[in-house]
């Protein structure tokens, strides 16, 4: 190919192409196709300009080379082929004298007749694809684009071809000749296939086969293939683009990009009001389990059988009393509901054969607690659209709540280790490939760090409760079914253990849509006295139902046992996600993996073993008012898992909004820390968007308080 180029092109063009490749550090002995492409492009630019002049009247004329005429001015200024510094000098000079807008990229020519810069393209592919790439890269309506192909096709901005038919035909003929000459030497196929879209300096990673098809399928709308998208991304200029878009929107909008300095950000304002309350679907750190070890009773594994067996392990039941009423509820109904559960469990035990499921009698207290007949009657819109005062019922704004320390305590507890194992090591077949070996090694190390974690208990508890509730909602739609809240684990010694946390009673559940609500009453055992933090238990009615003997350093002590009762609701879509809470393990494992990968790429070897076994090393876990908290790799695993689990337990629109908006501020602060001199506009609007998500959700308020700690330390 190199020999062909030297024979086929004018020596001046070859010399300019050599210079250009040298400037970009490319070897023409290796990049022979690129060498040919640069020469072709240069020749087309020169042919475009050749013989075109402007006469004294300012008209464009064509003068053949033998016509000596010194008074004529060249119609086109050639920018292509000059070294970069000189080329920009020419561009700046043209802009200063003609008032043309300065282009972001070096164009190829300037047309003095039409007063516009021109970008010339020569492509071995389809002209419209290459045209799009050029347009996406340049993003300027002022620069005119003209694309030629080796097949005689052309495409230009607004179909304005600038030159006369004959001049363009000369260029097309020359390109066709080059193609034939290459083909006769067996060089054309390689040259045609080597075009990589809008050229950038760095090497492209070629994608082929299935990955190529998948890449083309997963593009945003309006992009036909990965090259188009790459060209668009390569030429993307965020600041100019934002300012330009805003000025298009309205003449009044003026986006001034302000520098973002250490003194710029202020803390996020947390709302004032009464303290926030517990809103998870089941108790977390305050739950109490009635457990049986090595269960082998008849019907073991059937929830109702397991629950009755667990209930029999406790002998301290007493007459229940309300110790913390629910402010807005009818508390005697909650009391009667618990008594009814006890009675109906007694009735089951006296039966000859215990049933697999238990439907509660539809008593007045349960009907009240489950909101039976409380929903307003639904009327078809067509039947009432003529009603003159038809309106949607008013809904009150949610009351603002302030941050409360109990949610930080909940999170700390979720990161702790328990004395039980909550997940088994998945038994997966022999590793076949080295990468599988590394993956299973990482999974095993990670599992060992989190299998005892309380957050893992919450996962298994959540999966069980949501699965049982969704099953019952579909199988017994009209029944008030009693659903035991159960989990299974192993002791440190490896003995199996079944735990009962309490019960759920499900209301009517004709769930047609994903968001249709099923009401339920939850009744959960606890040793936590609700009077210590009454604000946390605002939505609960708490009963004292027994006394439990506990072993302590000073012997056995008796502690009151409480029952936390509340009405709650969930939907098919929420239960579906609750059933998939095991995904939290995967998410946190992937976060740990990216840390290992970063370490491995620095050391140029797999660092999995060192990562988990080097106990002396500490890692950043989070930020507290005292500064950056650090801990062992196990603590990092458990903290990441707890965050993922709490995102699932406390999922809400407030969390979605806060996460999305605060992330923007986080990225700006990180850019500042990395000395990237970030600029912003409408920072006040961003703070507004963040703060409108801070209403009453405890997990969102905790995240906001963490974010403020991060801001304080990041900007010191």
From Swiss-Prot:
Motif Nuclear localization signal 2 (NLS2) boundaries: 184-247
Subcellular location field: Host cytoplasm; Host nucleus
Entry-linked Pfam families: Flu_PA
Record GO terms (molecular function): endonuclease activity; metal ion binding; RNA binding
Main localization (coarse): host cell
Binding residues for Mn(2+) 2: 80, 108
GO BP field: cap snatching; DNA-templated transcription; symbiont-mediated suppression of host gene expression; symbiont-mediated suppression of host mRNA transcription via inhibition of RNA polymerase II activity; viral RNA genome replication; viral translational frameshifting
Top-level EC class: hydrolase
Cofactor note (record): Binds 2 manganese ions per subunit.
Keyword Metal-binding: yes
Residue ranges annotated as motif Nuclear localization signal 1 (NLS1): 124-139
GO cellular component: host cell cytoplasm; host cell nucleus
Enzyme Commission code: 3.1.-.-
Record key words, sorted: Cap snatching, Endonuclease, Eukaryotic host gene expression shutoff by virus, Eukaryotic host transcription shutoff by virus, Host cytoplasm, Host gene expression shutoff by virus, Host nucleus, Host-virus interaction, Hydrolase, Inhibition of host RNA polymerase II by virus, Manganese, Metal-binding, Nuclease, Phosphoprotein
Essential cofactor(s): Mn(2+)
Post-translational modification: Phosphorylated on serines and threonines by host kinases, including human casein kinase II.
Superkingdom of origin organism: Viruses
Annotated Mn(2+) 1 binding sites: 41, 108, 119-120
Described function: Plays an essential role in viral RNA transcription and replication by forming the heterotrimeric polymerase complex together with PB1 and PB2 subunits. The complex transcribes viral mRNAs by using a unique mechanism called cap-snatching. It consists in the hijacking and cleavage of host capped pre-mRNAs. These short capped RNAs are then used as primers for viral mRNAs. The PB2 subunit is responsible for the binding of the 5' cap of cellular pre-mRNAs which are subsequently cleaved after 10-13 nucleotides by the PA subunit that carries the endonuclease activity.
Family, similarity comment: Belongs to the influenza viruses PA family.
Assembly: Influenza RNA polymerase is composed of three subunits: PB1, PB2 and PA. Interacts (via C-terminus) with PB1 (via N-terminus).
Record-given protein name: Polymerase acidic protein
Organism field: Influenza A virus (strain A/USA:Texas/UR06-0195/2007 H1N1)
């Amino acid at each position: 190919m190199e020999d062909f180029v030297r024979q086929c092109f004018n020596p001046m063009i070859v010399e300019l192409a050599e210079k250009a490749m040298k400037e970009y550090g490319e070897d023409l002995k290796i990049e022979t196709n690129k060498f040919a492409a640069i020469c072709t492009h240069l020749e087309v630019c020169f042919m475009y300009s050749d013989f075109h002049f402007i006469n004294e009247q300012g008209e464009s004329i064509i003068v053949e080379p033998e016509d000596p005429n010194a008074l004529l001015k060249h119609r086109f200024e050639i920018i292509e082929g000059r070294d970069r510094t000189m080329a920009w000098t020419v561009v700046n000079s043209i802009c200063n004298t003609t008032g043309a807008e300065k282009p972001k990229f070096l164009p190829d020519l300037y047309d003095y007749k039409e007063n516009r810069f021109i970008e010339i393209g020569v492509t071995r592919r389809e002209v419209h694809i290459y045209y799009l790439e050029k347009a996406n890269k340049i993003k300027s309506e002022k620069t005119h684009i003209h694309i030629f192909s080796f097949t005689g096709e052309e495409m230009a901005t607004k179909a304005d071809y600038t030159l006369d038919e004959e001049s363009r035909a000369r260029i097309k003929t020359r390109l066709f000749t080059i193609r034939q000459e290459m083909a006769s030497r067996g060089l054309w196929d390689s040259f045609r296939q080597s075009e990589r879209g809008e050229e950038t300096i760095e090497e492209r990673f070629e994608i082929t086969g299935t990955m190529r098809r998948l890449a083309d399928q997963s593009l945003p709308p309006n992009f036909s293939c990965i090259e188009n998208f790459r060209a668009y991304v390569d030429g993307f200029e965020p600041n100019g683009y934002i300012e330009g878009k805003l000025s298009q929107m309205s003449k009044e909008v003026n986006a001034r990009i302000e520098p973002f300095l250490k003194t710029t950000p202020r803390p996020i304002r947390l709302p004032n009001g009464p303290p926030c309350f517990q809103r998870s679907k089941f108790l977390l750190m305050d739950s109490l389990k009635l457990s049986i070890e090595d269960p082998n009773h008849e019907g073991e594994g059937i929830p109702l059988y397991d629950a009755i067996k667990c209930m029999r392990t406790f002998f301290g039941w007493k007459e229940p009393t309300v110790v913390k009423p629910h402010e807005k509820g009818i508390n005697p109904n909650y009391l009667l509901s618990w008594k009814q559960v006890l009675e109906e469990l007694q009735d089951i035990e006296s039966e000859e054969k215990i049933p697999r499921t238990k439907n509660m009698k539809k008593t007045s207290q349960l009907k009240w607690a489950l909101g039976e007949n409380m929903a307003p009657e639904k009327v078809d819109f067509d039947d009432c659209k003529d009603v003159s005062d038809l309106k949607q019922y008013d809904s009150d704004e949610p009351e603002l709540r302030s941050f409360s320390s109990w949610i930080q305590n909940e999170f700390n507890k979720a990161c702790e280790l328990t004395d039980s194992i909550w997940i088994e090591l998945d038994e997966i077949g022999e590793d076949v490939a080295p990468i599988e070996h590394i993956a299973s090694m990482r999974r095993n190390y990670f599992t060992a760090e989190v299998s005892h974690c309380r957050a893992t208990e919450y996962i298994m508890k959540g999966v069980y409760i949501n699965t049982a509730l969704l099953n019952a909602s579909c199988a017994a739609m009209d029944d008030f079914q009693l659903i035991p809240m159960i989990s299974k684990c192993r002791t440190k010694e490896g003995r199996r253990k079944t735990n009962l946390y309490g019960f759920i009673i499900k209301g009517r559940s004709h769930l047609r849509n994903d968001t249709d609500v099923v009401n339920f009453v939850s009744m959960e055992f606890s040793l936590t006295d609700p009077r210590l933090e009454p604000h946390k238990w605002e939505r609960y009615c708490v009963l004292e139902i027994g006394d439990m003997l506990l072993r302590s350093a000073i012997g056995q002590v008796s502690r009151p046992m409480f029952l936390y009762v509340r009405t709650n609701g969930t939907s098919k879509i929420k239960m579906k996600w609750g059933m998939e809470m095991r995904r939290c393990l995967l998410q946190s494992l992937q976060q740990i993996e990216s840390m290992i990968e970063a370490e491995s790429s620095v050391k140029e070897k797999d660092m999995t073993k060192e990562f988990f076994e080097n106990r002396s090393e500490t890692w950043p876990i989070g930020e507290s008012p005292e500064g950056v908290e650090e801990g062992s790799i196990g603590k990092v695993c458990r903290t990441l898992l707890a965050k993922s689990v709490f995102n699932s337990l406390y999922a809400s629109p407030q969390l979605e909004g806060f996460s999305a908006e605060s992330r923007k501020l986080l990225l700006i602060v990180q850019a500042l820390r990395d000395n990237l001199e970030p600029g912003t506009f409408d920072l006040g609007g961003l703070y507004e968007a963040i703060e409108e998500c801070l209403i009453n959700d405890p997990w969102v308020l905790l995240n906001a308080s963490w974010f403020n700690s991060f801001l304080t330390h990041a900007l010191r």
